[in-house]
UniProtKB/Swiss-Prot annotation:
Function, in words: Can catalyze the hydrolysis of ATP in the presence of single-stranded DNA, the ATP-dependent uptake of single-stranded DNA by duplex DNA, and the ATP-dependent hybridization of homologous single-stranded DNAs. It interacts with LexA causing its activation and leading to its autocatalytic cleavage.
The organism's place on the tree of life at top rank: Bacteria
Primary gene name: recA
UniProt name for this protein: Protein RecA
Pfam annotation, one family: RecA
Native organism: Mycolicibacterium thermoresistibile (strain ATCC 19527 / DSM 44167 / CIP 105390 / JCM 6362 / NCTC 10409 / 316) (Mycobacterium thermoresistibile)
Family indicated by similarity: Belongs to the RecA family.
Database matches in InterPro entries: DNA_recomb/repair_RecA, DNA_recomb/repair_RecA_CS, Hint_dom_C, Hint_dom_N, Hint_dom_sf, Homing_endonucl, Intein_C, Intein_N
GO cellular component, one term: cytosol
CDD domains: Hint
GO molecular function list: ATP binding; ATP-dependent activity, acting on DNA; endonuclease activity; single-stranded DNA binding
Length: 424
């Protein structure tokens, strides 16, 4: 008595594999012609998407059933499509998962262009703590829209920030009061950041410990310029107050209560700043108040990253130090989670043949942007038990749940696969 061997699934003829030159080709054509091509493949050692040779081709005959997947993506018509056998392994945030165990709403890993440099990502982080927002792509694509907006008296500052993001497509708008807004093209690389920051339904921003640890002085400067104010106590004319003195207040009303406390503690513990929270004005808005000494220390930290039009928020001795220049990078393909929009059984056609390829080294490739396992190997199984009494519920990890970037749990799905008295 032998266990049933396992074959790791296949795709229909028309499923398009992504080639190393950026084009796509039907997997059936690659197999039938044994095309000597390189495909895109994920290298887990370098965390990069790289070209790899196809080293074997498989036509595994007719399939009993094929599942048609539709997955969100940022380019083209906003949809990735492929058809796979139910046992083909698809990469998800939680690991490899059989196609038949995935449903609409689950997320898979897909290759999407990343356009932001490290400097530009810091601008986004700082802006989100201030006046910036992230919103879903209005057309339902994989990506979120970053928006910056300021009043008519701060247009120069908005233009300075926009220039630092100058290689990202954007549009500008203006309201009746003269406030100006800049909306950037949806960026898939910011989707996880949006999920981490907008956790609740009240619109307040959740700033985690990991978010705070990622902040550089540039991000802190953006946050201060967006939402901070300086009350000058002394212009520095007296010998005892040379260089001037004052107190900073930064509004944190848009953050959750816990985020405000984490931010206060971060500034204290990481930068040694004497800051406290208080309620300001008739509306009782939450603000962070800096002591006179902390104000000087903070301004020394952020002075090299201030926009020229915002130097009025600096004490006189810290002005004129700005040295920020745009830092652009070429787009690179990176893995991001993408939501499954639809899964259904493909209607039977005259040709239901199953196709697959073997990829050198990494043993994975991409079909219309979605990461899948290559499947040449089979297992012969071995001796089977009369009854599978030890396995009655199949529990699979679907994805990792995060608080910011910290893993706090797993999303799982349980499926009854055998009862304790059923033979194999």
């Amino acid at each position: 008595r032998e266990k049933i061997g396992v074959m790791f699934g296949c795709f229909d003829y028309s499923t398009r594999a992504q080639l190393a030159d950026g084009t796509t080709e039907k997997i059936g054509k690659i197999v039938d012609n044994k095309m000597d091509v390189e495909v895109l493949s994920y290298d887990p050692d370098t965390d990069r998407i790289v070209p790899r040779k196809v080293v074997n081709w498989f036509n595994n005959g007719p399939a009993e059933q094929l599942l048609q997947f539709t997955v969100e993506k940022s380019g083209g018509n906003g949809r990735a499509r492929f058809a796979a056998t139910p046992n083909h392994l698809i990469r998800t945030p939680g690991g490899w998962t059989e196609a038949g165990d995935l449903i609409a709403g689950d997320r898979v890993l897909a290759a999407e262009p990343h356009r932001l440099s490290d400097q530009q990502f810091q601008i986004v982080l700082g802006s989100l703590m201030g006046d910036g927002t992230l919103s879903p792509d209005p057309r339902g694509r994989n990506g979120v829209r970053f928006r910056m907006g300021h009043g008519a008296d701060r247009v120069d500052y908005l233009e300075w920030k926009t220039a630092l993001l100058g290689n990202i497509k954007h549009s500008t708008g203006e309201n009746a009061e003269g406030a100006r807004f800049v909306d950037f093209t949806p960026l898939p690389e910011l989707a996880e950041l949006r999920r981490a920051v907008y956790l609740g339904d009240d619109g307040r921003k959740f700033i985690s410990e990991e978010y705070l640890k990622a902040l550089t002085p540039l991000a802190l400067a953006i946050w201060y310029m967006d939402d901070g104010s300086l009350t000058v106590r002394s212009e520095g004319l007296q010998q005892g107050t040379a260089g001037g003195s004052g107190r900073i207040e930064i509004c944190v009303e848009a953050m959750t209560e816990g985020s405000r406390i984490r931010l206060r503690d971060h500034l204290r513990d990481t930068h040694g700043l004497d800051v406290r929270l208080r309620q300001a004005g008739a509306g009782g808005k939450a603000v962070l108040v800096f002591s006179t000494a902390a104000t000087a220390e903070f301004q020394e930290l952020v002075a090299p990253y201030m926009a020229p039009s915002m130097e009025y928020k600096l004490l006189p001795r810290f002005r004129g130090q700005s040295r920020v220049v745009p830092q652009f990078v070429e787009p690179t393909q990176r893995l991001v989670p993408a939501r499954i929009l639809d899964v259904h059984v493909e209607p039977h056609t005259r040709s239901m043949n199953r196709y697959d390829i073997e990829v050198e080294g990494n043993h994975n490739y991409f079909v219309d942007g979605v990461m899948v396992h290559n499947s040449p190997e089979t297992t012969t199984g071995g001796k089977a038990l009369k009854f599978y009494a030890s396995v009655r519920i199949d529990v699979r990890r679907i994805e990792t749940l995060k608080d910011g970037t910290e893993a706090v749990g797993n999303r799982t799905r349980a499926k009854i696969v055998k009862n304790k008295v059923s033979p194999p």
